[in-house]
């Protein structure tokens, strides 16, 4: 194995010798953890996050909030750390709100939630907050948040880029009020404004003016979490105007929140059951959730598996056959890499639609999936808004990740069925799924 430099290290993706049969404890949800951190930081009293995800993205969020003055105390309870606590089961973070202030520098890494959720928070701080990050973060659009905050009264220096690096000159408060944005490139633009909205003097009314809004489950997650801490939110689903969300100004409560497992990160393990004709159990799968990953139950069942919610968790079983699928993934775009990997191993073609916005994610995921699967012998074509996948006999080779955690897990799925696949920079999975290689080999009994 090449170990130097680290980012070009090759990880031999384990090949499954038979059907998997495993219980996999998936760590907490990144999306829930980072929203909860923001809401707790803006609350009027301390709160707790239990079983938070400890990964690069969430540690960046915690570090950024600390930079602005928020207290975050991390504790681990050995009595509740099941199986060593690698799933975060014994961990709890106490968040102690404080007056937000600069000067401060925030490293966003390549975390969309950090780069988009925190500029509105910084506008409430007293003093300048500078945002910087990985080179790829400079290419990811922030204009939706920047333009909206300026319209609401914030002062931001970005040299006209509409992207990082930038500085928010916080004035200690923000007027807020109505604002129109085009969030068609990322639903995080809407969530970012809603999360801080209760602290704006007039609250906020966000009107989406663009084409189809992607990843709606993530906006529903934001709304649910706001309501859980006492915010009043009017939404299109609750009888409000289409594409308009209103948050009333008011104090947020400090809560004691237990973070759900990250269902999107359960995807490779469920895919392993599907691809090998085996069985995987994911404990603590919620009966009701706004996480996009819950859609996997329906999608992977259509592709040949079956699932049941039991007292043990979600029990997913493969049939030994993998079928192609024609599916609109606009609401669950983050699942695309894993679905594409399974589709490349199917017995019939697949069409994945509604995910043009993936070109703006951690990498251009559509171009990356096309290139990497085809270099293993596949037949994938980019369409205007997705991928067309015709299964072919695949062979081994290097699967590049482009510093994208979901590309790495997609390559691992293919490696189950194709001998000789090597994943470049599997360590990028630490962005949202720490210890992925150990969880993966543990599932296989290696």
Swiss-Prot record:
It is found in: Cytoplasm. GO terms for cellular component: cytoplasm. Signal peptide: none annotated. Phosphoenolpyruvate binds at residues 30, 112, 140, 188, 365, 406, 431. The keyword Amino-acid biosynthesis applies. GO terms for biological process: amino acid biosynthetic process; aromatic amino acid family biosynthetic process; chorismate biosynthetic process. Pathway: Metabolic intermediate biosynthesis; chorismate biosynthesis; chorismate from D-erythrose 4-phosphate and phosphoenolpyruvate: step 6/7. It catalyses: 3-phosphoshikimate + phosphoenolpyruvate = 5-O-(1-carboxyvinyl)-3-phosphoshikimate + phosphate. It comes from the Bacteria. GO terms for molecular function: 3-phosphoshikimate 1-carboxyvinyltransferase activity. Its EC number is 2.5.1.19. Catalyzes the transfer of the enolpyruvyl moiety of phosphoenolpyruvate (PEP) to the 5-hydroxyl of shikimate-3-phosphate (S3P) to produce enolpyruvyl shikimate-3-phosphate and inorganic phosphate. This is 3-phosphoshikimate 1-carboxyvinyltransferase. It comes from Streptomyces avermitilis (strain ATCC 31267 / DSM 46492 / JCM 5070 / NBRC 14893 / NCIMB 12804 / NRRL 8165 / MA-4680).
